[in-house]
From Swiss-Prot:
GO molecular function: 4-hydroxybenzoate polyprenyltransferase activity
Keyword Calcium on entry: no
Reaction catalyzed: all-trans-octaprenyl diphosphate + 4-hydroxybenzoate = 4-hydroxy-3-(all-trans-octaprenyl)benzoate + diphosphate
Keywords: Cell inner membrane, Cell membrane, Magnesium, Membrane, Transferase, Transmembrane, Transmembrane helix, Ubiquinone biosynthesis
CDD domains per the UniProt record, alphabetical: PT_UbiA_COQ2 (cd13959)
Cofactor(s) demanded: Mg(2+)
Membrane topology: Multi-pass membrane protein
Similarity remark: Belongs to the UbiA prenyltransferase family.
Name of the protein in question: 4-hydroxybenzoate octaprenyltransferase
Amino acid sequence: MYLQLLKSLNRLHPRAWDFVQLSRMDRPIGIYLLLWPTLSAVWIAGNGSPTLANVLIFGLGVVLMRAAGCCINDFADRKVDGHVKRTADRPLASGRVRPREALALFAMLVGVSFLLVLCTNSRTVWLSFGAVALAFCYPFMKRYTYYPQVVLGAAYSWGIPMAFTAAGGELPASAWLLYIANLLWTVGYDTYYAMVDRDDDLKIGVKSTAILFGDADRNIILTLQLLSLGCLLLAGSRFDLGGWFHLGLLGAAACFAWEYWSTRKLDRESCFKAFLHNHWAGLLVFIGVVLDYAFR
């Protein structure tokens, strides 16, 4: 039904679907992966009772900034996507959208996101510039470093400190444990994603942690995921989170174990499924946070 609604936009404009695909609104997995840790931070920062305004601001902000990130990503990769089987039909690579149109959509999405941030406070507004900088820089990093996933992790985690400053203006040191946990988790699942394209990336000179980790890829991903859980466990103790939160962490650990087992053959399909599966890990942690506050 969601996709049918998006496709109906073509009735308004014949090229609407091209821009839906450019912003990946037809593939909401990236929204979920960004949304759950951000909302977890909103709940913790609000001590279990976040304001409706903050929930809406950060929820909509996630959707808009993820879409903006996809636009600038495809702009940066427009000359290489055509050489990768999975991305050859993207709107920019196939010529259905012009580069300046992608930049215009990126600017528009960032502008609307900034209007949302203006509804918070000055410290959160200043932090938002870091979010835009990271979102813009990430897609270009894969040309120069084997650690673009770390930059993505920094970008995908930036909503966490913003959630705390929006809730009360203060940024406790413990909030950075949540930030580090999410960064490690993001590097892990995006490495699974990069493993899908590893053979193509090697041919065209695109760098990634999947290439850097080589044969140790799955073991390093699992290590990153366990370190992420450790940071969450420590953060939970600092924020007085208890049993329900710990159950959420156990659920996430089960997800990580399944991903490790399911990718043992290193085929593209299983690596892509492992990437998608991380949505459930993030959701379980978020549910654990919400229930822990709800049943106090």
